[in-house]
Regions:
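A short, surface-exposed alpha-helical micro-motif characterized by mixed small hydrophobic
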Residues: 14-16
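Conserved beta-strand-loop-alpha-helix hinge in the C-terminal portion
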Residues: 28-51
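Conserved catalytic/dimer-interface elements of ABC ATPase nucleotide-binding domains
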Residues: 22
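Extracellular glycan-binding segments that recognize GlcNAc-based cell-wall polysaccharides
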Residues: 56-392
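A cytosolic small-molecule/anion-sensing beta-strand core signal
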Residues: 25
Length: 392
C-alpha cells in the first residue's frame, strides 16, 4: 500500500481522496480510522476554543450522532433553503403561516435588523406575518410571491435605512389596491420604534408590557422577537448614542404601560431613569459577556408555557454570527405564531456548543423537531446531526 500525507483544512478532500486518516493535534493522535468518519469528527470539533469538559461533551456527541442512522436523524430536522437571505426568510414564513389568512402584512427592510425587531411585536398585535423586502429599490421575487399569495388588505412597511419610495409605489400599484402605511422613512431606529408605537397606541394594539433593547445587541433582540410577537409587546430600539429615554418614558406613560423589560447591557444602564418615572423595570441579560443563551432560555420557557399541551415545538436554530441577522428577519412571526423559539450557537466555541447540547438533551420532551436557519452562514452538517441526535 501507499501512505500519503495530506496537510489540508478541506475535510471533503480528505474524505474523498483517502481511505484512512489520522487527526494529529499538538503532537498527539486525537483520532484515526475511516477517512470520512475522521473528517466529519474534525469538522465538528477542530479549530474551536473552549474548556476541556466542553470539548469532551462535543466529541462524545459527534461520535454518538455519526453512529446513528442518517435517515433517522434527518427525520428530526429540516433546513431552510433558498437562493439568498430574503428568499430563505420568506420561505420560512410561508411554511410557518400555511393555512392561515393575513388581512395585514408587515414588510421589513433588510438594511438593518431594527426593522424586524420593531415589527415583531407590532405584527403579533395584528396577527400578521412578516415579509422580508429583499432589496431597497424594488421587492425581491420572494417578497412579491409572498405578498401575492397572502393578498393582504393592509401592508405596514418598516423602512429605517430603506426600502425606498420605489417600493412603496410598487406596493400601491397592486391590482387589489392594499392600503400601505410606512414607518421609519429617513429616521433612526428609535424614531422608527416611536412611530410604530404611536400607531399601535392609537389603535389599542398593545399589551401591558414593553421591551427596550439597544441597537448593538442585535442577537439578543432577534432572540427575543418570538416572545414580543406572542405578547403583542411594543419594542423600542435605542440608538447607540442614546443619552436619555425621556421621550420613550412619556410615550409609555401615555399608553398606561408600566411594565418595562430592559434587555441587554445597553438598555439596562437606563434602569434608574425608568424607575424614577414610576415604571416597573425588569432587567434581562444585563450582565457583561455573552448573554444570548440567557435570553434564549427565557423565551424558550415562555413559548413552552403557551404551546399546545403534549406537542413539542419546532425549535429554530441559527449560528451565532455577527453577519447572521439578515437570515433571521422573519423569526419573530415564525416563532411567535407557532409557539417556538430561536436558539443561537457559536460554532467556533465549544462551550457554546456544549451548552446547546446539554439544554436540548434536558428538554428533549419539549422539542419535536429542529429547523436550521442560515444558508452558508448557518451550521454545518456535523453540527446539525449532533444537535438532532440530542433530541432523537
Amino acid at each position: 500500500g501507499v501512505t500519503v500525507l495530506i496537510v489540508s483544512h478541506s475535510n471533503d478532500q480528505i474524505a474523498r481522496l483517502c481511505n484512512k486518516a489520522i487527526w494529529i493535534e499538538k503532537g498527539h493522535t486525537r483520532l484515526m480510522g475511516d477517512a470520512g468518519y475522521v473528517a466529519r469528527i474534525y469538522g465538528g470539533l477542530g479549530g474551536r476554543t473552549g474548556s476541556k469538559e466542553s470539548e469532551e461533551c462535543v466529541f462524545d456527541a459527534l461520535k454518538t450522532a455519526l453512529a446513528k442512522d442518517d435517515d433517522e436523524l434527518k427525520s428530526r430536522y429540516s433546513v431552510v433553503e433558498g437562493e439568498n437571505s430574503g428568499s430563505r426568510n420568506n420561505r420560512m414564513m410561508l411554511q410557518s403561516w400555511k393555512g392561515r389568512e393575513a388581512s395585514s402584512v408587515c414588510l421589513v427592510g433588510d438594511s438593518t435588523h431594527a426593522n424586524a425587531v420593531v415589527a415583531s411585536g407590532f405584527a403579533g398585535a395584528l396577527g400578521a406575518p412578516i415579509v422580508a423586502c429583499g432589496g431597497n429599490e424594488k421587492l425581491s421575487e420572494s417578497a412579491e410571491h409572498a405578498l401575492l399569495e397572502l393578498h393582504p388588505d393592509k401592508i405596514f412597511v418598516f423602512r429605517s435605512d430603506g426600502p425606498e419610495d420605489k417600493v412603496i409605489d410598487q406596493l400601491e400599484s397592486y391590482s387589489w389596491k392594499p392600503t400601505v402605511i410606512s414607518f421609519g422613512e429617513g429616521v433612526t431606529a428609535t424614531d422608527l420604534s416611536q412611530q410604530a408605537f404611536d400607531y399601535g397606541r392609537d389603535y389599542s394594539l398593545w399589551g401591558d408590557e414593553a421591551y427596550v433593547v439597544d441597537f448593538t445587541d442585535n442577537s439578543q433582540s432577534l432572540l427575543l422577537s418570538p416572545m414580543t410577537y406572542a405578547k403583542h409587546a411594543p419594542v423600542f430600539v435605542l440608538n447607540p448614542w442614546q443619552e436619555d429615554c425621556s421621550a420613550i418614558i412619556a410615550s409609555l406613560t401615555s399608553a398606561n404601560i408600566n411594565r418595562i423589560a430592559l434587555v441587554g447591557p445597553g438598555a439596562s444602564k437606563f434602569q434608574d431613569e425608568f424607575d424614577s418615572a414610576g415604571l416597573r423595570t425588569n432587567l434581562i441579560a444585563a450582565g457583561e459577556g455573552d448573554t444570548c443563551f440567557e435570553v434564549f432560555k427565557m423565551v424558550f420557557d415562555f413559548m413552552s408555557s403557551i404551546g399546545r399541551s403534549g406537542s413539542g415545538m419546532e425549535l429554530m436554530i441559527a449560528s451565532r454570527d455577527f453577519d447572521q441577522w439578515p437570515e433571521l428577519l422573519t423569526v419573530g412571526c415564525c416563532g411567535g405564531a407557532n409557539h417556538s423559539a430561536l436558539m443561537m450557537m457559536d460554532k467556533t466555541n465549544l462551550d457554546s456548543e456544549a451548552a446547546c447540547l446539554d439544554y436540548l438533551a434536558s428538554h428533549a420532551s419539549s422539542v419535536s423537531r429542529l429547523l436550521f436557519v442560515g444558508g452558508r452562514l448557518g451550521l454545518g452538517a456535523e453540527e446539525q446531526a449532533m444537535l438532532a441526535s440530542s433530541i432523537a
